[in-house]
Amino acid sequence: MEDFKQSVNTYSSEGRIHQIEYAMKAMNLGTTTIGVRTKEFVILCSEKKILSTLQNPKSVVKHYKIYDHIVLGFSGISGDTKTIVKRSRDFCISHTHMYGENISVERLLKYLSSLSLRFGEEDEAKMIFRRPFGVSLIIAGFDTEPRLYSLDPSGSYISYKAKAIGSGHEVVEGILENEYEEYSGLDQSLRKVLCTLSKVMKDKISKDNVEVVVVTQEESKFLTPEEVSVYL
């Protein structure tokens, strides 16, 4: 039984791959990230875990720009995320050079889904890690319309109107289910998503311990701490 629990590419007698289940648990240990999609924009809002007053808040990054119209947020092992970000950026650039067009958000998701399942490759040149990714991702983008997806370590991805990942995801998703219809204008939506995030944060919310990005048809705008403070 222990062999099944250690193996990354063997099913147990119950039809489970335990290493993927462990990765699914790891992704919920990180700070909370919220994604909300409307007809005009997508917002990503994340808690930044500041461990010391001596720490530079700018050194903690929760959102990464993958391409002009695609942003990634995560919860879980940050080192895994950096590998995913690099691979994603390279893939998007390659797609544009090959086809002469911006990549669609779902095309990137399909690539990431296949990438997440390459942990058991015998060919080391193809293998990314020797274990599943220990992160859950939220992808916000705008191609023909606003897009919001979540991808878990099993390679499964789903489109959402609103989604939360991380340690506070259950509480946040309960709030989003009841209040999603109240998200309309950008200013109101920013205030609302920050208020929701504050309810699952151990520390008092401030401009330095949250990160916010807004994706529209025109741009992916990362709000400065001063801009965030306006909505707190």
Curated annotation (Swiss-Prot):
One of its GO terms (cellular component) is nucleus. The keyword Cytoplasm applies. Its main location: cytoplasm. InterPro entries: Ntn_hydrolases_N (IPR029055), Proteasome_alpha (IPR050115), Proteasome_alpha-type (IPR023332), Proteasome_asu_N (IPR000426), Proteasome_sua/b (IPR001353). PANTHER family: PROTEASOME SUBUNIT ALPHA/BETA. The proteasome degrades poly-ubiquitinated proteins in the cytoplasm and in the nucleus. It is essential for the regulated turnover of proteins and for the removal of misfolded proteins. The proteasome is a multicatalytic proteinase complex that is characterized by its ability to cleave peptides with Arg, Phe, Tyr, Leu, and Glu adjacent to the leaving group at neutral or slightly basic pH. It has an ATP-dependent proteolytic activity. This is Probable proteasome subunit alpha type-5. It comes from Encephalitozoon cuniculi (strain GB-M1). The gene is PUP2.
